[in-house]
Amino acid sequence: MGFVELNLTGIIQLLNFLILLFVLYKFLYKPFLQIADKRREKIQSDLASAEKELKEAQEMKKQAHDALESARKSADGIISEARQKSEEIINQAKVKAREEAEKVLNSARNEIEREKKQALQEIEKRAGEIAVTLALKILQGVLDEKAKREYLINILNKEKEK
């Protein structure tokens, strides 16, 4: 019987071992595998999410870079346009100043010409008066030759001084 006992003990031990394996599998190993699977799925999900966010961040970075370049080009265009407008304004001011200077110069020339004509008319008038006065004196015979010259020189000197 010792042999059978041993055999029965071995079978009971084997049966206890199998029950223990079943209990361990059911209550420890299977939940552990489920937790490990969930953990693996979460890690994969987090990795996929991180890759997606990285791609989005790179796209946003590219968009920001493009927007910055566009803003730079726009600013350069605005600055260039402002420079051109300022040059146009300066050129217009120069042209206007030249025109004004020409007007002032022409006005001054016209005024000088008018005063010159007036002076010539005044000289002609005076010369006529002098000639008449001189002729009267000569006709009257009042002046002798020397007095006539002195009188004439006197009158001409006075006219030059005016």
UniProtKB/Swiss-Prot annotation:
Segments passing through the bilayer: 8-28
Keywords (A to Z) from UniProt: ATP synthesis, Cell inner membrane, Cell membrane, CF(0), Hydrogen ion transport, Ion transport, Membrane, Transmembrane, Transmembrane helix, Transport
Claim: Cell inner membrane is one of the keywords in the record: yes
GO CC, one annotated term: proton-transporting ATP synthase complex
Molecular functions per Gene Ontology: proton-transporting ATP synthase activity, rotational mechanism; proton-transporting ATPase activity, rotational mechanism
Keyword 4Fe-4S: no
UniProt record similarity statement: Belongs to the ATPase B chain family.
Stored HAMAP family: ATP_synth_b_bprime (MF_01398)
Function of the protein: F(1)F(0) ATP synthase produces ATP from ADP in the presence of a proton or sodium gradient. F-type ATPases consist of two structural domains, F(1) containing the extramembraneous catalytic core and F(0) containing the membrane proton channel, linked together by a central stalk and a peripheral stalk. During catalysis, ATP synthesis in the catalytic domain of F(1) is coupled via a rotary mechanism of the central stalk subunits to proton translocation.
Protein's name in the database: ATP synthase subunit b
Record lineage: Bacteria, Thermotogati, Thermotogota, Thermotogae, Thermotogales
